[in-house]
From Swiss-Prot:
It holds the Pfam family HcgF. InterPro entries: HcgF. HAMAP family: UPF0254. This is UPF0254 protein Mlab_1743. Belongs to the UPF0254 family. It comes from the Archaea. Signal peptide: none annotated.
Length: 172
């Protein structure tokens, strides 16, 4: 049974919540296209980590220098978010001993989502562009929802294909 852990920022732990609901067989917001009875997964941990201190203390790595920090929350440009999401996915997998790690982070631009296994790591960005500094709550929540959908869709494709499609960006 594959185990999964998440280190989430802009998705606020909702990816882990959705995966756990799927694993336990009760409906939630995301409608998986795969049959729950044919897939056996377990969520080891779901972490909400919006701060530099959280990255350092929970994931045990030195994060990239953010563009700025707002009330202890790290704010990156989109390219940095893609790198940080990958590093967060790898770190949460390592720290928890999970088979698969998922990382999400977003500051300025589209949100970044990464999924890592022992030998691969891939990243995608959300469809929604927002700016943590200036966007209204509605826009930020639209990006969050897009991030949860992107992460879960990427996870489904990984399970269905057994590997990542070539169309996903590789950031290592």
């Amino acid at each position: 049974m594959p185990t999964i852990s998440t280190a989430e920022c802009f998705t606020h732990g909702k990816v882990a919540n959705e995966l756990h609901a799927f694993a336990r067989g009760y409906p939630h917001e995301y409608l998986f296209s795969i049959d729950r009875k044919k897939v056996d997964i377990s969520v080891v941990a779901g972490m909400f980590i919006p701060t530099l201190t959280g990255v350092r203390t929970l994931l045990h790595f030195e994060p990239l220098e953010p563009r700025l920090v707002i009330d202890t929350v790290k704010v990156y440009e989109q390219d940095q978010d893609c790198i940080m999401a990958c590093r967060m996915a790898e770190a949460v997998m390592r720290v928890t001993g999970a088979d698969i790690g998922i990382g999400t982070t977003a500051g300025i631009g589209k949100g970044a989502v990464a999924i890592a296994s022992q030998d691969k790591i891939y990243s995608k960005v959300t469809r929604i562009d927002a700016d943590f500094r200036t966007s209204d709550a509605k826009k930020l929540m639209q990006r969050e929802k897009s991030g949860v959908f992107t992460a879960l869709r990427l996870f489904e494709e990984f399970l269905l294909e057994g590997e990542f499609p070539d169309s996903y960006n590789k950031y290592i």
